[in-house]
């Protein structure tokens, strides 16, 4: 269980932001309008409320900041020393102390100015006292800028610290830089620590978790330690020293016997002896890493004696230390190191709990009661003989049913045929006699019955299923298939020749016209200026060729084109008669015609969008069919347009001062509008 959650500490604002937060809150939460005509008591209350509220806001905000940060005397020594190493305990305490002093000074300031405000005799004097009190409070907070900035940096770093439980089962990895601590941790856990071929890749503590005997174990990877005095060690190394000093865990001291880390075995052994005091009263394992590069038997004799001295109390080592070879590359020995370390720590923790006074207080309450025999007489359970006999008979019946074979009709027939044979009388059952079955084979030659064949199925083998004329049958099938394909080809030729010459020419003309229409459609889609359909002129040549393709006579074609031209002239919408046209060219319209044209002009004014009559080649029979197609097209686009989203071309003028944010009632109830 993790004891501390530093991520809950709220953000510490800068001094300027602090002042803005408090003053804006005071402006929002207190009345803002006062007049000199009001009674002096009301004026004093108005300004005293502002001073009180500002001081209270400062007090609450500072109290929350001071309370969120942990007190070094109240937390676990491991975290207290870690904060001291990372942030300097003196600087940390001074910053919190300055905020506490500022809080007390603000409280005293508010008391002094409230006392003066009680005797204010005018609005101007009360306002100046309020202004002076708030100004002194803000000046006081401006001076706390460096402390607030430092505490915000501490908060950010504390939130990024790993969640280490100092009281749980822990494996602690230590040793020189680049000896394989992070690689070993990645093998044990899923922490995914960064591994690089240079020293001091790990610059802080990393935590992973693994399972052993249905329990969760905490694995801590510490930065590398160098062999020099304590006061010369930097912040990175001091994190490892802090973890070794305060966490009760099983320590795994890793030694690179291949010396590829850049340090000799003698230097690594010297480091062990220099920090030996941190290993006392803790389970200890010395892990000989990188045996894939150099086997333990290849280590020089002098270096091997130095390694063995780590577990020899006579030569300054620690008794009970285990020496285990291991390789992170080949994973040789990793499971053994894990099992040994967890088992040693588990036994040590159990033994420690049994020695505690709490166990002694509780263990006398446990009592194991065992019955004692009153005499030497054997009192076995009494089971009636009938029950025993029935159980035996049931077992025999079950066994006989299990051994009884299931016989088919052919087997029964075989038994009946050989029932009088001597072998059957001797106990040889014919259904299990292979030769008895071979006698029943149906073969052309009886000598073949006892041949050794790979498979027997109801008295037949593979040769019985092979047709001797198989090649001849294959040739017949191929000839039949060729005849079928030839017949299909002839049928296709017959279908193609169903049309006579005139129809074939018409079919070719239709195909050519389709191709021409397709090309014209592609040309229309090209990016060239186009005229609207309502103002486009009539192409008489195209219309004449179209009518000719529909087998119209030349006289009919001329009449149709003239009628269409006259009709299109009469359908020009909204076009006024030009000034140059003489009134004598056309007869004066009658009153009925004038009324009809007036009604038509009104109806045309109402319709904002009109559909032009279908042009030749559009594929519409008449205007009604085109209108119906246009309506279906709009209906199909409606659902797609509903899913439209705002794009770069859309423009929107925002309301920069929305009224619902800049007007409204006040909490005091003095105004209906701001």
Swiss-Prot record:
Residues 570-580 have a biased composition (Basic residues). The keyword Nucleotide-binding applies. Residues 169-346 form the OBG-type G domain. One of its GO terms (biological process) is ribosomal large subunit biogenesis. Keywords: GTP-binding, Nucleotide-binding, Nucleus, Ribosome biogenesis. Residues 518-538, 564-674 are annotated as: Disordered. GO terms for molecular function: GTP binding; GTPase activity; RNA binding. It is found in: Nucleus, Nucleolus. GO terms for cellular component: nucleolus. CDD domains: NOG. Residues 518-527, 619-633, 641-653 have a biased composition (Basic and acidic residues). GTP binds at residues 175-182, 221-225, 289-292. Pfam families: NOG1, NOG1_N, NOGCT. The keyword GTP-binding applies. Belongs to the TRAFAC class OBG-HflX-like GTPase superfamily. OBG GTPase family. NOG subfamily. Involved in the biogenesis of the 60S ribosomal subunit. PANTHER family: NUCLEOLAR GTP-BINDING PROTEIN 1. This is Probable nucleolar GTP-binding protein 1. It comes from Dictyostelium discoideum (Social amoeba). The gene is nog1.
């Amino acid at each position: 269980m993790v004891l501390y959650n530093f991520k809950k500490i709220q953000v510490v604002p800068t001094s300027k932001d602090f002042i803005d937060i408090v003053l804006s809150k005071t402006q929002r939460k207190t009345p803002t309008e006062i007049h000199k005509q009001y009674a002096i008591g009301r004026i004093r209350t108005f300004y005293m409320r502002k001073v009180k509220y500002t001081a209270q806001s400062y007090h609450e905000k500072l109290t929350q900041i001071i309370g969120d940060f942990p007190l070094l005397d109240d937390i676990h020594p491991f975290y207290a020393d870690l904060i001291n190493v990372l942030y300097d305990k003196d600087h940390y305490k001074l910053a919190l102390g300055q905020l506490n002093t500022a809080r007390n000074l603000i409280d005293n300031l508010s008391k002094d100015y409230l006392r003066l405000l009680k005797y204010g005799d005018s609005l101007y004097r009360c306002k100046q006292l309020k202004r002076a009190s708030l100004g002194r409070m803000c000046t006081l907070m401006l001076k706390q800028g460096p402390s607030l900035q430092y505490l915000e940096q501490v908060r950010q770093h504390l939130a990024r610290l790993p969640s280490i439980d100092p009281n749980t089962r822990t494996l602690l990895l230590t040793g020189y830089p680049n000896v394989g601590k992070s690689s070993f941790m990645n093998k044990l856990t899923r922490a995914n620590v960064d591994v690089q071929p240079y020293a001091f890749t790990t610059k802080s503590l990393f935590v992973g978790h693994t399972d052993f005997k249905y329990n969760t174990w905490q694995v801590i990877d510490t930065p590398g330690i160098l062999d020099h005095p304590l006061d010369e060690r930097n912040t990175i190394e001091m994190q490892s020293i802090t973890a070794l000093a305060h966490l009760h865990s099983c320590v795994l001291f890793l030694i690179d016997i291949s010396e590829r880390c850049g340090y000799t075995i003698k230097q690594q052994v010297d480091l062990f002896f220099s920090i030996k005091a941190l290993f006392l009263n803790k389970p200890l394992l010395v892990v000989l890493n990188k045996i894939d590069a150099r086997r333990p038997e290849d280590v020089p004799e002098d270096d091997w004696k130095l390694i063995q001295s780590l577990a020899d109390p006579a030569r300054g080592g620690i008794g009970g230390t285990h020496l285990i070879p291991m390789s992170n590359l080949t994973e040789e020995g990793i499971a053994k190191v894990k099992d040994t370390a967890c088992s040693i720590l588990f036994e040590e923790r159990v033994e420690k709990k049994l020695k505690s006074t709490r166990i002694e207080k509780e263990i006398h309450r446990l009592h194991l009661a065992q019955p004692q025999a009153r005499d030497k007489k054997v009192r076995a359970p009494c089971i009636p003989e009938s029950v025993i006999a029935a159980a035996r008979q049931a077992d025999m019946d079950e066994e006989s049913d299990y051994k009884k074979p299931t016989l088919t009709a052919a087997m029964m027939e075989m038994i009946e045929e050989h029932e009088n044979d001597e072998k059957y009388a001797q106990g040889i059952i014919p259904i299990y006699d292979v030769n008895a079955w071979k006698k029943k084979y149906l073969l052309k030659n009886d000598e073949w019955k006892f041949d050794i064949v790979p498979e027997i199925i109801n008295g037949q083998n593979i040769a019985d299923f092979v047709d001797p004329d198989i090649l001849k049958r294959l040739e017949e099938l191929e000839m039949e298939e060729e005849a079928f394909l030839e017949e299909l080809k002839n049928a296709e030729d017959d279908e193609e020749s169903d049309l006579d010459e005139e129809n074939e020419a018409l079919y070719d003309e239709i195909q050519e016209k389709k191709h021409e229409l397709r090309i014209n459609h592609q040309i229309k889609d090209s990016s060239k200026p186009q005229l609207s359909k309502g103002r486009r002129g009539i192409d008489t040549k195209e219309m004449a060729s179209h009518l000719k393709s529909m087998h119209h006579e030349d006289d009919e074609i001329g009449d149709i084109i003239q009628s269409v031209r006259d009709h299109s002239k009469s359908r020009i919408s909204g076009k006024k008669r030009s000034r140059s046209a003489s009134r004598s060219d056309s007869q004066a319209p009658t009153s009925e015609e004038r009324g009809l044209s007036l009604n038509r002009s009104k109806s045309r004014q109402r319709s904002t969008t009109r559909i032009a009559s279908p042009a030749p080649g559009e594929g519409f029979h008449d205007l009604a069919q085109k209108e119906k197609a246009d309506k279906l097209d709009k209906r199909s686009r409606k659902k797609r347009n509903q899913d439209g989203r705002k794009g770069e071309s859309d423009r929107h003028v925002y309301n920069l001062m929305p009224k619902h944010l800049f007007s409204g009632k006040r909490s005091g109830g003095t105004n209906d509008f701001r």
